[in-house]
Structures are given as C-alpha cells and as structure tokens.
C-alpha cells in the first residue's frame, strides 16, 4: 500500500513546464532597398525622368509616362482607370516599385496609374526587359520605379504650383525640402480634381458621371550617421473619389470610391 501511494505521489508531482527563454532573441535585420535597379541594369534599357521633366508635365503619372517613355497605356478617359503595357505585355507583367517596394495590387496584380501623382516623386525610372522579373509578380515586360532621393547638403526650398484647365479641372502641389549635412526631409501635398464634362463631337451630349478628385500626401526623412550608414523613412497617403463615365448610348451613373 505504501509503495502504491509513493508511486502515485511521484507521478502527480512530475509535470512539464514551458515558459519563455530568459535571454533576448536577436532577430536578423531586414533591409528594404532598390539596389537591384543599380546592380542589375547595366545591360538593360532604362529611362530616368528627373524632377525638372516631372514638373513640366501634367500631374498624373499616366500623362508623364505617355509623353516621355515608350510605355503604352490603356486608359478609359482622363482620370479613369489606366493600365500600362510594355511591348505587348499586360499590366500584371509590369511591376511598379515605390522606393524598392512592389506596390502592385495583391488582388489583380497591377497598378492604376491615375491614382499616382508624379509630383510626389523626384525621380522616376522606366526599366524595360525581362530582367525585371527580379522584382517578382512575373514582370517580364518591365518595371517603373518611383523614387524619393535624399540630398545631404544645406537646402531649404518651397515649391507651389497651381494649374487650371477646361471642364473645371484643377491641380495643386506644394513641396517642402529641408536638408543639411546630417538630415534630409521632403514633404509634398497634391490635389487634383475635374468635372470632366466635355462635349461629344457630333452629338448634343456631354460626358456624364466622369468627375474625380484625389489628394495625396508624401513625406520622407533621412539621417546620415556617417558616410556608410544612413536611415530612411518613407510614407505615402492617398485618398480619392472617382466616378465612372458611361457611353453615348447608355450613360451610367455608377460610382467608384
């Protein structure tokens, strides 16, 4: 009886205890950079659009690339859905890289170029060819890189641009740049809107339900510790409200938010 009782007490006192480790686990750092653009583009055809070229064109990224690159765009009208095509490939085979990060939609694998304002970036690079598959998403057509570059020198600049056009089309952009040898910061705010109610030639009708408006806020900050070490922070916010135009035969009043 005593042996059975002793064995029972031993069994109930034995248990497994799991708990956290008493030491700190050091995780490996993760680097997000666009070094592939520099390291793997020597044999690729690249076109770089500087800030001076960007400022001379319209605000939408579609308009900028249409007149300054070989990219063909399938667009449903001003401010409507716009998708690119490199050398006959589809929009899903074109990667859009924002400061080294692929921003193609996870749902349809493409980017609507009328939801991006070109003046929020100070460097845009168009890279053609199948070598762009290093960015994923089967980008055998090419890649479009939207970059915000840093300038670590004494600088304080303000830029304000206002545009007015037909059919109640308005565009505004303000950019602030502040930098010294250690610190660099850029911030920009853009707003675009239009009633888009143009007349159909040969018909006594106007384009209905084609209005749109969007606002974007972009900022990036960099700090240089020494000649070999820097830290960068990027942020981009976008808010848009867009309707879809109908056709002459059957006008539509549908709306896309």
Please report, for each region that a protein language model flagged, where it lies by residue:
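Extracytoplasmic beta-strand/coil segments of soluble accessory domains associated
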Residues: 62-102
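N-terminal periplasmic "start-of-domain" segments of outer-membrane beta-barrel proteins
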Residues: 24-56, 83, 124
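Structural signature of outer-membrane beta-barrel domains
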Residues: 37, 91, 103, 149, ...
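Transmembrane beta-barrel outer-membrane domains
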Residues: 25, 77, 137, 165-169, ...
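Predominantly transmembrane beta-strands of Gram-negative outer membrane beta-barrel pores used
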Residues: 95, 123-127, 131, 143-149, ...
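Short acidic/polar hinge/loop motifs at secondary-structure boundaries
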Residues: 73, 101-129
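N-terminal periplasmic accessory domains that precede
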Residues: 61-64, 82-85, 111-117, 126, ...
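Flexible loop and strand-edge segments within Gram-negative outer membrane beta-barrel domains
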Residues: 194-198, 204, 208-214, 224-257
């Amino acid at each position: 009886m005593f042996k059975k009782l002793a064995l029972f007490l031993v069994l109930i006192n034995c248990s497994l205890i799991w708990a956290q480790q008493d030491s700190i686990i050091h995780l490996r750092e993760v680097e997000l950079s666009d070094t592939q653009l520099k390291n793997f583009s020597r044999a690729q055809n690249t076109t770089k659009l500087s800030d001076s070229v960007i400022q001379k064109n319209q605000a939408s990224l579609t308009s900028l690339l249409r007149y300054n690159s070989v990219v063909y765009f399938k667009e449903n009208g001003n401010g409507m859905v716009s998708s690119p095509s490199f050398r006959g490939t589809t929009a899903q085979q074109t990667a859009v890289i924002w400061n080294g990060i692929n921003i193609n939609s996870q749902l349809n694998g493409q980017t609507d170029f009328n939801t991006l304002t070109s003046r929020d970036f100070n460097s845009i690079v168009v890279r053609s060819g199948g070598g762009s598959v290093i960015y994923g998403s089967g980008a055998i057509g090419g890649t479009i890189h939207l970059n915000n570059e840093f300038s670590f020198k004494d600088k304080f600049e303000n830029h304000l641009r206002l545009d007015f056009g037909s059919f109640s089309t308005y565009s505004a952009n303000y950019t602030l740049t502040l930098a010294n040898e250690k610190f660099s910061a850029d911030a920009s705010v853009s707003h675009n809107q239009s009633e888009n109610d143009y007349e159909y030639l040969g018909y006594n009708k106007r384009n209905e339900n084609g209005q749109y408006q969007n606002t974007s806020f972009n900022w990036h900050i960099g700090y240089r510790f020494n000649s070999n070490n820097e830290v960068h922070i990027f942020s981009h916010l976008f808010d848009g409200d867009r309707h879809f135009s109908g056709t002459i035969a059957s006008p539509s009043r549908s709306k896309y938010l």
